[in-house]
């Protein structure tokens, strides 16, 4: 929903009815990799993204002649962090210059590159204003999906668009969550 104010957007959201069929899901990554598991994207045929072996030198030979070897699995749990301030972004499209200006509470390398690639823009068609006061991120405010969305809408509508997460939005759908990994 795009609206002139947050109140209007929230009122409009109440009028939306979503008719969705719940899909099967798997929370354990190792179970998801089993051939018997339902693929997240059926057209891919499996839940495996990449199957590649990286080898530097005669690793198997080195292990065969080693007196001792150690094998173990490392797991760290899912985490959620709470930045002091939630993510905010403002985008403005200048149709004359074909330039997207982004102001965001971000401290991230390759931010501009990720936005231009997602929006299919040349890399010199974006100006990111990093001069916004930013604090309390602790490395978790990425905001790429927010910035791409706001940049797209600003370009489509031809007017400045901003998105400021509230705390509930940040906890539900922000970028401050890390998956469980093995």
Q: What is the predicted function of each stretch?
A:
Residues 1-12, 16, 138-182:
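Glycine-rich and small/hydrophobic secondary-structure elements
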Residues 1-114, 139:
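Extended, polar/acidic
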Residues 16-18, 116-121, 179-180:
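Short, solvent-exposed amphipathic alpha-helical segments in soluble enzyme
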Residues 70-74, 102-104, 126-130, 161-166:
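General beta-strand structural signal in soluble alpha/beta enzymes
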Residues 76, 109-110, 133-135, 167-171:
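Short acidic loop-to-helix transition motifs that present clustered carboxylates
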Residues 89-95, 113-125, 148-163:
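Proline/glycine-anchored alpha-helix kink/cap motifs
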Residues 93-97, 130-134, 167:
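Short, histidine-centered active-site or binding-site loop motifs used for metal coordination
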Residues 126, 133-142:
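Glycine/serine-rich anion-binding loops at beta->alpha junctions
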